[in-house]
Design a protein with these regions (language model features):
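Short acidic donor-binding/metal-coordinating loop in glycosyltransferase active sites
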Residues: 1-3, 96
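Conserved donor NDP-sugar-binding/catalytic core segment of glycosyltransferases
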Residues: 3-41
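Alpha-helical elements of Rossmann-like donor-binding domains used by nucleotide-donor carbohydrate transfer enzymes
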Residues: 9-13, 99-103, 133, 163, ...
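Short, flexible, basic/aromatic active-site loop/helix in glycosyltransferases
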Residues: 28-32, 46-67
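A recurrent flexible, glycine/aromatic-enriched loop bordering the glycosyltransferase active site
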Residues: 56-77, 93, 99, 141, ...
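A short, conserved alpha-helix in the catalytic core of glycosyltransferases
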Residues: 75-77, 81-86, 91-118
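Active-site-adjacent helix/loop segment of glycosyltransferases
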Residues: 111-190
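Juxtamembrane C-terminal module of membrane proteins
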Residues: 156, 160, 190-221
Length: 221
């Protein structure tokens, strides 16, 4: 991983939520690095706010897909529950952390977001990289319908685009709006194509995917 602890208290703060025996996993806040543009910085703040919270199955109607969000860029798991539920799935192109978190939520456990635990982590993806990354996201949603099909994920993406647009207008960063539109378009197109990858030619799927090694016969057995 390319995440860097923001301070020396990362592990200590990541473990604090386990004082609640119902918490089965906890994940840290991600802060954009110095080379990030303001859109990436806003995205990190949107996905990783300063306020802590604990999610349970009761939050599904309100939070939707975000209930299952638990980025393993920097996360911890209660070992006995992790093993009891079988650990990370062995066959997935992407999203093993969210699939694990969904299993925990559905089993009645809770997921904690601990923003006091901080790591520096962000990426500057090109339009093509945004497309391929979200293609793989769509593939994972297709392959695990029991986890993802019952909850719409597009609404959260639309909310992010709207909030980012409002932010850019407020900051008078009008020249960045076309970039936001293009980035969002490539993300959405990639996701929708990945969601329907099984009706596409295999050679085309390989070209669209970021994680090309996943499509080797050995990895898919």
């Amino acid at each position: 991983q390319d995440a860097i602890p923001a301070d020396e208290y990362l592990i200590e703060n990541l473990l604090k939520p386990y004082k609640d025996p119902r918490v089965s996993a906890a994940y840290a806040r991600q802060i954009a690095n110095d080379s990030s543009d303001i859109i990436e910085e806003f995205t990190r703040n949107f996905n990783y706010p300063k306020k802590s919270y604990v999610k349970s199955k009761a939050d599904l109607p309100k939070m939707g897909i975000k209930t299952y969000f638990c980025s393993n860029v920097c996360a911890s798991y209660r070992n006995d529950i992790y093993k009891k539920l079988g650990g990370f799935v062995k066959k997935t192109i992407f999203n093993e952390d969210m699939i694990m978190a969904a299993g925990m939520i559905e089993a009645g456990y809770r997921i904690a977001y601990s923003p006091e635990a901080k790591v520096i982590h962000s990426h500057r993806y090109s339009y093509l990289q945004q497309f391929t990354r979200n293609f793989d996201l769509g593939v994972s949603h297709n392959q695990y319908p029991d986890v993802f099909r019952k909850i719409k994920s597009e609404s959260e993406g639309i909310k992010l685009v709207k909030r980012t647009l409002q932010f850019l207008i407020k900051k008078k960063e009008y020249l960045l709006i076309p970039d936001l539109i293009l980035t969002s378009g490539f993300k959405y197109l990639g996701y929708q194509m990945g969601l329907h990858y099984d009706i596409l030619p295999e050679s085309f799927v390989l070209r669209c995917s970021m994680n090309k090694s996943y499509w080797s016969k050995e990895n898919r057995k």
